[in-house]
Curated annotation (Swiss-Prot):
Organism, as annotated: Synechococcus sp. (strain RCC307)
Oligomeric and partner information: Homodimer.
Protein name listed in UniProt: LL-diaminopimelate aminotransferase
Lineage, opening ranks: Bacteria, Bacillati, Cyanobacteriota, Cyanophyceae, Synechococcales
NCBIfam families: DAPAT_plant
Main function: Involved in the synthesis of meso-diaminopimelate (m-DAP or DL-DAP), required for both lysine and peptidoglycan biosynthesis. Catalyzes the direct conversion of tetrahydrodipicolinate to LL-diaminopimelate.
Name of the gene encoding the protein in the UniProt record: dapL
Amino acid sequence: MALVNGNYLKLKAGYLFPEIGRRVKAFSEANPDAALIRLGIGDVTEPLPQACRDAMKNAIDEMGTREGFHGYGPEQGYAWLREAIAKHDFQSRGCDISAEEIFVSDGSKCDSSNILDILGEGNRIAVTDPVYPVYVDSNVMAGRTGDANEGGQYGGLSYLPITAANDFTAPLPSTPVDLIYLCFPNNPTGAVASREQLKSWVDYALEHKALILFDAAYEAFIQDPAIPHSIFEIEGARQCAIEFRSFSKNAGFTGTRCALTVVPKGLMGTSATGEQVELWGLWNRRQSTKFNGVSYIVQRGAEAVYSEQGQAEVKALINFYMENAAIIRRELSAAGLTIYGGEHAPYVWIKTPEGMDSWGFFDHLLNRANVVGTPGSGFGAAGEGYFRLSAFNSRSNVDEAMRRIRAL
């Protein structure tokens, strides 16, 4: 008899986005002529940068020759891409990160889940609330939590509320924790963390020998030069942090798949017997065993992001989406809604109207305006009463969605 992983049975009824898909499918079947505008899931809509497309076309042509063919590549990523990432994304900002500390992968969502493979089951875990659901669900699947309570919070996790009441600034844990998930710019709220705020987290982690798992997937959308793009801009972070990044949102690689994880050499964890163990070696072994690497063609496309042409085209993409965010902020504010985020991230975080909860507002927009967004309660108990709209769409769709919502 094949036994299932019982931890999966502890998951709530459905992962947030499949539940959205279920409701949208039911609506579409009942209203086949409705012209839906999707501002929910954070998928990009604009074409890949020309520099990336050209690089991938050239790589395909290389693969068509015996001399240029590439089979299995290094599980950690090709050296030329790792070196470009280290130089442009980290060393240019004063971060002491080498190419060897960068692991190229097929998604930061995957890596932020897979990192649990090298971390023990007894860790005390802190997440913000609201939170990107993957951080919580992956811990549930791995058996790192208890059951969920009526509010959807799992035993064994410390929830750190980020709401308008605390200016979306996560408080430091009131009890010691070992793993801390941070995402800035934040998904879903769009909030950012100042240098001083990040320093307080690094100081906490160093004091308590905790590990920060820092998701910087949206760092390219930061508009203020004073706001850090990386946890490694903070002194001491090499001794307490792992960072996840992605090419999905800045360069449109959601359908192409390329990301990276930074594991500094010398970053240590503790074994059950109290021995100090370097996490770089464990992650390297994990990737070498379970991952065959990102394709040569895709990595050449990612490398082109760092060319002069690629940088200009990526900047244009980011500006386009941030202009969409500005339109959403302006129009919904004019409609009398209370708006947060959307200034350094492609997400606008909306306070739902009085007397309407998150899923109620979802159904209201779906049925009355034919606009799809994301209920805040799907990101955690503290997200109840909020709603997320994404700036990832065409300008015409964003304009039309705002016109419909304002007409309600």
